[in-house]
Structure formats: C-alpha cells, structure tokens
C-alpha cells in the first residue's frame, strides 16, 4: 500500500533548543523524523546539535554504519543496509497526536547494535 503526504503552510512547526523543526501530518498524527540530538564526534563527548533556519523533518535520518553481511540471509538480518549510512546517526523520530501541553505517555526504543 502506498502512502503520500504533502507539506503545506499548515505543516506542524515546533521550536526546540536546537532550532525550529517542520514535520508533516498523516493519519491524525504530527510526525517528525531525523531530528538530530547530538553532533557526531568520534571519541569525544557529545555536543548538542543546533541548526539555523527550519529543519526539514519529513524523512528519516542516517543509520549508523554497518558492516556488509556476506551470508545470503543478510537481507533478513539487516534490511536497512541500503539506507543512507553516516556517523551523523544521532537522530530521533517523533509521532504525536497533538502539539499542545498535555501530558502523554512516551515510548522510548533503544535499538541494539
């Protein structure tokens, strides 16, 4: 099933400590993808990510670099190996039913690897 969305003047826009972020609405949710939460600095303490202007948060950020899997079942184990990889993979994705001050449950998923 294909899904489409469009960014328009009423696309959700939020201000964060790093800068402004514009997402999109789909199926009753405000969605923000690929928001950086730290700078990629190998072997150094993390630094907050900041940006000028409005960050386009309508697509996923980079995934962390992975080694190629030489076995035939590699597709099943690492299906995202075709996604864009970069050390700047410190990003998060947010789905929320509304942009207000209501208290809502939060699910945090820390992936392995």
Label for each model-derived stretch:
Residues 2-113:
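Non-catalytic accessory segments of hydrolases
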